[in-house]
């Protein structure tokens, strides 16, 4: 009997994690002249728009697994992004990020870096699965998941998306070479070598200005090798500086890390934590890497 119950439990867990379905994310701007659709239609801006979308999805879902972009299409005045989900956890994280506004925040950050959107432009989004507008059901994620399950893909990935994916991969550099020994006080990021050094107040300010709601995720990664951030330390920081806002919470987090670790609080450890939490674009900001068009 126990073995039967265990099998049912395992089957149930597998069923809970399995998911196949589609959703369409519509992206728009308050500016009629400078918006995602017009920039995507312009051959000079197409790749940059695609990169903004990929970075936004990676930050929202926490990685690149469990979903794919099938097609980008004209849904005037919006740019429609058709997404296929192949697993429950990434789909659920996507919905939660969309519901709490994190996805829009990520989109705004990446668009301001990579696209020439004028100051003051407001980003508009809408999410649909089949005939259902999921924005009306975000208070109940299970309903949204059911609608996505019912919306099955009717096409394979568009050739243009495949080409853009390949262009994005190529933009990160040539194929990997045989591993070489790194010089002392250096570290590797995206196949490039960077000088390692202790974190500075300028790093602290840059981190706080850009990390937003994800400062806690970075803190959880840093706490694995930092005694001062273990236990309830991160939650205590969140509570203590709640009134001051996200900037101060993030600033104090990295300050606590620097104060505790001294000269061992190095840039490489922060970049490693950002990589672990799939925050590649944030790592690029900390390293001052200019986006590639």
Swiss-Prot record:
Residue ranges the record marks as coiled coil: none
Keyword Cell division attached: no
Gene Ontology BP terms: extrinsic apoptotic signaling pathway; positive regulation of apoptotic process; positive regulation of canonical NF-kappaB signal transduction
Localization annotation: Nucleus; Cytoplasm; Cytoplasm, Cytoskeleton
InterPro entries per the UniProt record, alphabetical: DEATH-like_dom_sf (IPR011029), Death_dom (IPR000488), TRADD (IPR035712), TRADD_N (IPR009095), TRADD_N_sf (IPR036729)
Location of the motif Nuclear export signal: 156-171
CDD domains: Death_TRADD (cd08780)
Matches recorded under Pfam families: Death, TRADD_N
UniProt motif (Nuclear localization signal) ranges: 216-229
Domain Death: 200-290
GO cellular component: cytoplasm; cytoskeleton; nucleus; tumor necrosis factor receptor superfamily complex
Keywords assigned: Apoptosis, Cytoplasm, Cytoskeleton, Nucleus
Chain segments annotated as transmembrane: none
Keyword Transcription applies: no
Gene Ontology molecular function: any one: transmembrane receptor protein tyrosine kinase adaptor activity
Principal localisation: nucleus
Free-text domain note: Requires the intact death domain to associate with tnfrsf1a.
Matching PANTHER family: TUMOR NECROSIS FACTOR RECEPTOR TYPE 1-ASSOCIATED DEATH DOMAIN PROTEIN
Subunit comment: Heterodimer with tnfrsf1a.
Task performed by this protein: Adapter molecule for tnfrsf1a that specifically associates with the cytoplasmic domain of activated tnfrsf1a mediating its interaction with fadd.
Protein's name in the database: Tumor necrosis factor receptor type 1-associated DEATH domain protein
Gene source species: Danio rerio (Zebrafish)
Lineage: Eukaryota, Metazoa, Chordata, Craniata, Vertebrata
């Amino acid at each position: 009997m126990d073995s039967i119950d265990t099998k049912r439990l395992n089957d149930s867990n597998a069923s809970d994690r399995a998911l196949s379905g589609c959703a369409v994310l519509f992206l728009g701007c308050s500016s009629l002249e400078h918006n995602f659709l017009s920039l995507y239609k312009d051959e000079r801006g197409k790749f940059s728009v695609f990169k903004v979308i990929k970075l936004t999805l990676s930050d929202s879902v926490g990685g690149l697994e469990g979903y794919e972009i099938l097609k980008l299409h004209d849904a005037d005045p919006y740019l429609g992004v058709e997404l296929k989900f192949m697993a429950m956890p990434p789909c659920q994280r996507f919905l939660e990020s969309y519901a709490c506004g994190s996805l829009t925040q990520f989109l705004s950050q990446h668009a301001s870096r990579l696209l020439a959107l004028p100051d003051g432009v407001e980003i508009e989004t809408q999410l649909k699965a089949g005939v259902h507008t999921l924005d009306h059901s975000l208070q109940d994620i299970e309903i949204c998941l059911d609608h996505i399950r019912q919306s099955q893909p009717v096409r394979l990935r568009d050739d243009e998306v495949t080409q853009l994916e390949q262009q994005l991969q190529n933009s990160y550099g040539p194929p990997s070479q045989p591993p070489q020994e790194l010089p002392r006080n250096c570290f590797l990021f995206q196949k490039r070598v960077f000088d390692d050094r202790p974190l500075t107040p300028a790093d602290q300010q840059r981190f706080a200005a850009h990390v937003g709601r994800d400062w806690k995720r970075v803190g959880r990664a840093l706490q694995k090798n930092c005694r001062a951030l273990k236990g309830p330390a991160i939650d205590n920081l969140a509570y203590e500086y709640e009134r001051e806002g996200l900037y101060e919470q993030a600033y104090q987090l990295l300050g606590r890390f620097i104060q505790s670790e001294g000269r061992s609080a190095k840039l490489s450890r922060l970049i490693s934590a950002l990589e672990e939490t799939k925050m590649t674009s944030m790592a690029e900001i900390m390293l001052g890497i200019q986006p590639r068009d």
